Every structure is written in structure tokens, then in C-alpha cells.
Amino acid sequence: FEMTLACMQRADFIQRIAREAAQDLVMDNVRYAELRFAPLLCTRNGLSPEAVVEAALDGLRGYPIKLLLCAMRQNDPADSMRTVDLALRYRDHGVVGVDLAGPEEGFLPSRHTRAFKKAESAGLGITIHAGEVSGMESLRSAVKEGFAHRLGHGIQLSSTMQANGGLDPLAWE
């Protein structure tokens, strides 16, 4: 991850990465895709978050590809709010939602409820990575306190199969 991030600290590199990802998807006959990345992690060398998003959007221009901006669950919830605000600023330019990524253990989505409530109220798409290593507590928090429309991973849902063969009630909500 660190090596990838090191390559995403210049606007021209971010633009190229986005463009090449879009080209690869189109060559694979993908008709629509959403790329996700954490723009606040691409500011180590002085780029503003806005410049980061604009570079990615420039790289995607002309392709059927949109962006999800990731907040990192281990980071300060204020960073999540900054990410949501950034997504709102660029929602009419190709940003379609936000995502909460990063390590589940010890970092429930409930830490970021304020930011994701704002995203939900504004109509942004919300994806939360949950249920990869942690169980139902993480999944419930993603849906109930993170307002998730989609779950990244969610593989722990299968381990919650009830004895009668049914899914946990959360799966039907």
C-alpha cells in the first residue's frame, strides 16, 4: 500500500493512473465502473485534496468511470468529514459517493457517523468496508451508523447463518 501511495503524490501521476485504469476497464468491455481512492492520502508532497481529485477526474474524462472518495476508518473522523465535503464539491463532476476503508479491528464505522450522515442526507452513495475480518458488530455498525448502501467485502455474513438456514435479520434490512 505504501508503495502505491508513493506513486500517487503528484497530479500528473494521479491523472495517468486514473487514465490507464479507465483504458484497461474499457478494453475489458466494462461499461461502467467506480474507482475508489483516498485523496487525503495523496497530499504528502503538498498537493491539495482538491488538486488530487481534479487530477483523477481529468484522467477519467471521456470514460464511463466515476469516483468514490475513501475516508480511512483509522484516521480522525474530521478527515472523514473533509472527504465527504470534497465528494459534495465534485459530485457534479464525476464523484458519485464515499467509502470507508481501512482496518476494521478497533475502528467501527460509528466513529464516522456524523460524516456519513451528511453524505446520506446529501444523497451521495455510501460504501463501507465491513465484515472482512470482523463479524456482525462491524456489519451492523456499517449499515446502522454508517448508512451504508453497499458493503465492501461482507464475507462474514455467511458465518452468521442461523441454525435454521436463514441469514441474520441484518441481511434483510
Question: For the regions a protein language model found, what residue spans apply to each?
Answer:
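Active-site glycine-centered loops adjacent to acidic/histidine catalytic or metal-binding residues
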Residues: 129
